[in-house]
Amino acid sequence: MNKEPMSMHGYNKICAELKQLKEVERPNIVKEIDIARGHGDLKENAEYHAAKEKQRFIEARIVDLSEIVANAQVIDPSALAHNKVSFGSTIKILNLDNDKEFSYTIVGSVESDPAKGLISFGSPIAKSLIGKSKGDAVSIQLPNGESDFEILDIYYKEICFDEN
């Protein structure tokens, strides 16, 4: 698997979820399964089957998060030069088709929140912008077709990761 770039915040968030799953959720579901097992015939025991399904979900999530942590590449975006679009850059772009301005910050996939302008480095928009400079024109394939954009500004600003 490829390295997964993320900020220290993203890394800590993933590690905290992984710890919660391993130390709290996994032991709790084992207890739930034991309790449900005591309720009789397992073939028709909905509580048991629901607990086993939850256990499968928890175990799969642990595997996924463990893989992300193993492949994490923690990047401090404040230490990067943002003269070209890179991880952690905030980019102001102008849609040349409709004169609308947009602002995006490129983050790791585990940190992305498009509604807040935080887009994954692996998204089509970010892939089209990475490596480009202020003033460059870029064509980006969007769900409703290709659009042309101009990069108005590239800079670094500290990202406020709101957990709400």
From Swiss-Prot:
One of its GO terms (biological process) is regulation of DNA-templated transcription elongation. It comes from the Bacteria. Pfam families: GreA_GreB, GreA_GreB_N. InterPro entries: GreA/GreB_C_sf, TF_GreA/GreB_CS, Tscrpt_elong_fac_GreA, Tscrpt_elong_fac_GreA/B, Tscrpt_elong_fac_GreA/B_C, Tscrpt_elong_fac_GreA/B_fam, Tscrpt_elong_fac_GreA/B_N, Tscrpt_elong_fac_GreA/B_N_sf. Keywords: DNA-binding, Transcription, Transcription regulation. One of its GO terms (molecular function) is DNA binding. Gene3D superfamilies: Transcription elongation factor, GreA/GreB, C-terminal domain, Transcription elongation factor, GreA/GreB, N-terminal domain. Belongs to the GreA/GreB family. Necessary for efficient RNA polymerase transcription elongation past template-encoded arresting sites. The arresting sites in DNA have the property of trapping a certain fraction of elongating RNA polymerases that pass through, resulting in locked ternary complexes. Cleavage of the nascent transcript by cleavage factors such as GreA or GreB allows the resumption of elongation from the new 3'terminus. GreA releases sequences of 2 to 3 nucleotides. This is Transcription elongation factor GreA. It comes from Helicobacter pylori (strain ATCC 700392 / 26695) (Campylobacter pylori).
